[in-house]
């Protein structure tokens, strides 16, 4: 390493203490960088940092008192807000809607491959579904009647995955966050009632202004969740969920309910009979949701409706295969 490199950071042995002192649902304030042979501060600043360099921020983040030499392999804490940034983007991965969907200032309706950038607001009409693919492979799925703003979608010079902040203003959103993202790269989703910080996971978020309630349901990984008026986030793990009340308070964590199982089918009378499928009732279910499509992954044309009883009406059978997904919904609104 070039011996002219001054220590303008502290070795990252303090990173764990520093990071844990913040609410993990908040934005991580530093990025870790490992010093390489030939690095000098001037080279690092020119390549990675916004100019002019905010020396006060560097000194504050690293608790510097003296300039010293920094060995190769040491990890540096660089304040996130001084790192160079560039725009990232998402693209429409799948789309199912009988009517055109437009975003503000767009000359054309959404289509497969349409590029979505920071600031876009996507409002999904009833009976429609939209999926977005981020540059790092993360997927955002918007079901019927959802409204989502892409508040932040940008990359910085030190991390490969984009920083993501989403605001859900209506309905539900399903997220499959790429597991290869760095733990310090922000991926956050907010509703008027809750804030979720993500570290590589699959989960769902719901919000209804009519019911004045929200939900967080984790299918894999860990989601740091807090209500908008809570002071501390709680980790929600796979198979668990938490309802959020109208005051922005996260309520008791619940086990997500299992789906109802297929029990039997009874044919109706007629030359082309329909069927009534009997489902095994789930004791704590308030109602059930059935999604159906012509593809096994439920992309393309997709319909969704609620079942108040554990019975599913299946129209006459055709040569076209239909796939069904059944879920149970608890009294607090958590979807299993």
Residue ranges and their predicted role:
Residues 21-49:
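Primarily a LysM-type cell-wall glycan-binding module
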Residues 22-27, 50-87:
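Extracellular LysM carbohydrate-binding repeats and other cell-envelope/extracellular binding modules
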Residues 37, 71-265, 270-273:
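Flexible, surface-exposed loop/linker segments and immediately adjacent secondary-structure boundaries
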Residues 273-285:
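Conserved aromatic anchor
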Residues 302-308:
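Short beta-strand segments within Ig-like beta-sandwich modules, predominantly Fibronectin type-III
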Residues 314-322:
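Surface-exposed, short loops/turns at beta-strand junctions within beta-sandwich domains
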Residues 331-336:
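Extracellular fibronectin type III
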């Amino acid at each position: 390493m070039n011996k002219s490199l001054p220590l303008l950071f502290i070795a990252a042995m303090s990173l764990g203490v520093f990071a844990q002192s913040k609410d993990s649902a908040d934005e991580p304030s530093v990025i870790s960088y490992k010093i390489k042979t030939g690095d000098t501060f001037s080279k690092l600043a020119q390549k990675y940092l916004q100019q002019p360099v905010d020396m006060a921020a560097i000194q504050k983040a690293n608790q510097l008192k003296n300039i010293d030499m920094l060995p190769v392999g040491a990890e540096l804490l660089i304040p996130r807000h001084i790192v160079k940034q560039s725009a990232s983007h998402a693209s429409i991965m799948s789309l199912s809607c009988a009517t055109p969907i437009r975003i503000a200032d767009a000359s054309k309706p959404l289509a497969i491959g349409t590029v979505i950038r920071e600031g876009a607001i996507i409002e999904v009409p009833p009976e429609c579904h939209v999926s977005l693919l981020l540059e790092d492979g993360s997927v955002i799925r918007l079901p019927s009647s959802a409204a989502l703003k892409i508040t932040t979608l940008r990359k910085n010079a030190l991390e490969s995955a984009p920083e993501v902040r989403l605001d859900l203003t209506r309905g539900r959103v399903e997220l499959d966050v790429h597991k290869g993202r760095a733990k310090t790269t922000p991926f956050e989703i907010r509703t008027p009632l809750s804030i979720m910080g993500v570290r590589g996971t699959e989960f769902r978020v719901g919000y209804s202004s009519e019911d004045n309630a929200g939900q967080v349901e984790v299918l894999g990984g860990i989601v740091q969740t807090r209500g908008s008026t809570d002071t501390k986030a709680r980790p929600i793990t796979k198979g668990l969920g938490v309802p959020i009340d109208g005051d922005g308070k996260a309520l008791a964590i619940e086990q997500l309910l299992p789906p109802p199982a297929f029990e039997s089918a009874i044919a109706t009378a007629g030359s082309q009979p329909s069927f009534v499928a009997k489902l095994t009732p789930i004791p704590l279910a308030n109602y059930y949701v059935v999604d159906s499509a012509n593809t096994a992954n439920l992309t393309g044309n997709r319909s969704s409706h609620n079942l108040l009883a554990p019975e599913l009406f299946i129209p006459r059978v055709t040569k076209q295969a239909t796939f069904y997904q059944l879920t149970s919904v608890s009294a607090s609104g958590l979807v299993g």
